[in-house]
Amino acid sequence: MAEYQRICLVHYHEIGLKGHNRSKFEMRLLKNLEAHLCAYPVVTIHRISGRLCVFLKEGTSHDTMVECADAIRSIPGTARVSCGFKCERDLDQMTEAGILAMGESGAFASFKVHARRNHTDFPVNSMEINQIVGGRLSEAYPQVKVKMKDPDLTVGIEVVQNAAYVYARSIPGIGGLPVGSSGTVMSLLSSGIDSPVALWRIARRGAVCIGVHFSGRPQTSDASEFLVDDIAHVLEKTGCIARVYVVPFGDYQREIALSAPPELRVILYRRLMFRVAERIAFYEHAKAIVTGESLGQVASQTLDNIRATNDAVSLPVFRPLIGSDKLEIIAQSQRLGTFPISSQDAPDCCTLFMPRNPETHANLTAVREAEAAFPIDQWVEELACAAEPHDYACPAYKPRKKSLHDLMTENDGD
């Protein structure tokens, strides 16, 4: 039996509905795959008739192909990944490749063949391919039943212009849209459980995510910053995070805690955080702010308090977890691989100078009056200028030539 080149066929769903913009989404996904599969023996990646095909080097083992497919499935924009072989547009070769693919698919009691002919210059139509190749595969596996509805295994055959692709093992991807196809957002990122999940959900919708972490430094240690860095390294494996700004926030919290009404501290902290995030967002050309808030989960996340924090900024604020309960968020965190990191205790600004009885139904007028006692605009500029950027692997992100600090320093000089 001949040796055939191994491939991973990448199927997508939403991208296929994009009409005239479809090619842009396909190319964005292709570029993201190229960047994140550099550790695997990939020869090239091509667009073929509504799919992306990842071609692997000659001699690539089955296990390596499966590892590559597992990496692909976690890239936003991927609906399904199929492991298989490239062969000639020849029924004998399609049969041989099908036998190989079935042999690597584990145990199954029934199967069917599903062929798709994308070029009519091949004389055998899809139904005939199903019948001919299906009959031959049935002879090769006489103990296995042919079952047209809900079989254990489906052997797919894609006949394109100059080749055929045959596969049997398919695994679901995470779906969504490729990162970089939906603009840029600024995501508040703590070392806790919720915010990394919120960031991932927005990245899965195609946004380039830039994190901003408010550290309790110098009033606390920098332990939370190391945890956030670990979280970012998990998220960067799939290109979901481009950069994290670390903002030393502790001294400003202390100023608020010393002078503001105790019950309003948390809201004033968050309003200042939002303003700083928005200031950095303008520099990064980000179009929205993202938080990990879930309605009613803690005191700051009631409707009145959410309204009071939203009032501080002009950018839209996205809350991907707003309707999720804690168990759902934890389960998603475990699947992402961030949960073990987020479960570690570290002092941060979320626990610093917390009041005993925080306001749960803030009056917006009272909040604005309390905030007016502080030089908020000055603080926003100081905090944004002090923000420390840390970059991660995100092929869709193009950093500006001048840093935020340099740009703000130049403006101050003017």
Question: Whereabouts are the PLM-identified features?
Answer:
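RNA-binding accessory domains that recognize and position tRNA/RNA substrates
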Residues: 1-186, 196-242, 359, 364, ...
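Active-site adenylate/phosphate-handling loop in enzymes that bind or generate adenylated species
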Residues: 132-137, 143, 170-182, 249, ...
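Structural beta-sheet core signal
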Residues: 187, 211-213, 246, 291, ...
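Conserved G/P- and acidic residue-centered "switch" motifs that form tight phosphate/ATP-binding loops
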Residues: 192
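A conserved beta-strand->alpha-helix junction
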Residues: 232-259, 346-349
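Small/polar glycine-rich anion-binding or flexible loop at a beta-alpha turn
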Residues: 297, 345-353
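A short alpha-helix-loop-beta-strand transition element characteristic
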Residues: 337-345
